[in-house]
Curated annotation (Swiss-Prot):
UniProt protein name: Cytochrome b
InterPro entries membership: Cyt_b/b6_C, Cyt_b/b6_C_sf, Cyt_b/b6_N, Cytb/b6-like_sf, Cytochrome_b, Cytochrome_b_C_euk/bac, Cytochrome_b_N_euk/bac, Di-haem_cyt_TM
Positions bound to heme b b562: H83, H182
Gene: MT-CYB
Transport recorded as keyword: yes
One GO location term (cellular component): mitochondrial inner membrane
CDD domains xrefs: cytochrome_b_C (cd00290), Cytochrome_b_N (cd00284)
Compartment list: Mitochondrion inner membrane
């Protein structure tokens, strides 16, 4: 009798994706982040569902409904903080996952890579709208500033912004629709993640050496299931350390002040995971230019496969490219720091230089260094 696991239409899909999947024998811990992102998404959907049971998306009661969740609902405080810090863990895993793709040349799977970029945009949109929901000062002013950027679009800008707001400012209509979108997007993200996996399984996983591993494959289960469980335990440990010891470490104290359209906070800034893009936005004095730079800071990932000039796929054996990669990481950390600073003398120029360097590394230096490495190897 043939195994039902391999024949039943439903279990067959699971079997071919997570059990009998042929995987390279040498993939490192950097390949754990895909499954960790899946776990993050599940945590966010579950905690978000329970929060939505008690949350009210009306300007008069939104802030107090979040307070009510934390004070009166059984374990509401832990659900709320798991959701807020779960978003931070989600973005840490996302950045490491994208960084792994850049380092090891995984972007050569163009379909998988492009779906990944769409996923990144979708998760960023979801996180932004989620930050508006508690209706604190940063929620309100963050929503005002970021949606207002769309007014930089020529001709239709102002109409577009007012259409998104549902009025002449961020108000009831805006909050209600943001809640609706924030609820639906994670399910769209789940579907996109399935497509992301579908395309990945067409080619199989890449590996640290960047060399095809068809001659040396091992089954996903038990080798990588147990490895993923270890990764999941470490992820949950880190999340719970944040939630139970320093739940407000990554948040902004201003968001504990109810939204007030008449009082602007001294420093309007987004959550930490958007600061690098916010710094790039602010480093350009022109409004439309800043918006374009902001979008391009993520969209630039889409042309990386076209700029791959090296004869090798991975950076494992390319020390010069490695130096550039880590310079890029340092540059992104610098941008993250600058994004949280006020617009004053030293920070403005540092932000502008870091922004220029970011695009220079990705668009100019990486392809040139790759060609130099090819020539050094007489290829």
């Amino acid at each position: 009798m043939t195994n039902i696991r391999k024949t039943h239409p439903l279990t067959k899909i699971i079997n071919n994706s997570f059990i009998d999947l042929p995987a390279p024998s040498n993939i490192s811990a950097w390949w754990n982040f895909g499954s960790l992102l899946g776990i993050c998404l599940i945590i966010q959907i579950l905690t978000g569902l329970f929060l939505a049971m008690h949350y009210t998306s009306d300007t008069a009661t939104a802030f107090s409904s979040v307070t009510h969740i934390c004070r009166d609902v059984n374990y509401g405080w832990i659900i709320r903080y798991m959701h807020a810090n779960g978003a931070s863990m989600f973005f840490i895993c996302l950045f490491l996952h994208v960084g792994r793709g850049l380092y090891y040349g995984s972007y050569m799977f163009t379909e998988t890579w492009n779906i990944g970029i769409i996923l990144l945009f979708a998760v960023m949109a979801t996180a932004f709208m989620g930050y508006v929901l508690p209706w604190g000062q940063m929620s309100f002013w963050g929503a005002t500033v970021i949606t207002n950027l769309l007014s930089a679009i020529p001709y239709i800008g102002t109409n577009l912004v007012e259409w998104i707001w549902g009025g002449f400012s961020v108000d009831k209509a805006t909050l209600t629709r943001f809640f609706a979108f924030h609820f639906i997007l994670p399910f769209i993200i789940s579907a996109l993640a399935a497509v992301h996996l579908l395309f990945l399984h067409e080619t199989g996983s890449n590996n640290p050496s960047g060399i095809p591993s068809d001659s040396d494959k091992i089954p996903f289960h038990p080798y990588y299931t147990i490895k993923d469980i270890l990764g999941a335990l470490l992820l949950i440990l880190m999340l719970m350390l944040l939630v139970l010891f320093t739940p407000d470490l990554l948040g902004d104290p201003d968001n504990y002040i109810p939204a007030n359209p008449l009082n602007t906070p001294p420093h309007i800034k987004p959550e930490w995971y958007f600061l690098f893009a916010y710094a790039i936005l602010r480093s350009i004095p022109n409004k439309l230019g800043g918006v374009l730079a902001l979008i391009l800071s993520i969209l630039v990932l889409a042309i990386i496969p076209l700029l791959h000039t090296s004869k090798q796929r991975s950076m494992m054996f390319r020390p010069l490219s490695q130096c550039l990669f880590w310079l890029l990481v340092a540059d992104l950390l610098t941008l993250t720091w600058i994004g949280g600073q006020p617009v004053e003398h030293p920070f403005i120029i540092i932000g502008q230089l870091a922004s220029i360097l970011y695009f220079m590394i990705l668009l100019v230096l990486m392809p040139i260094i790759s060609i130099i490495e090819n020539n050094m190897l007489k290829w």
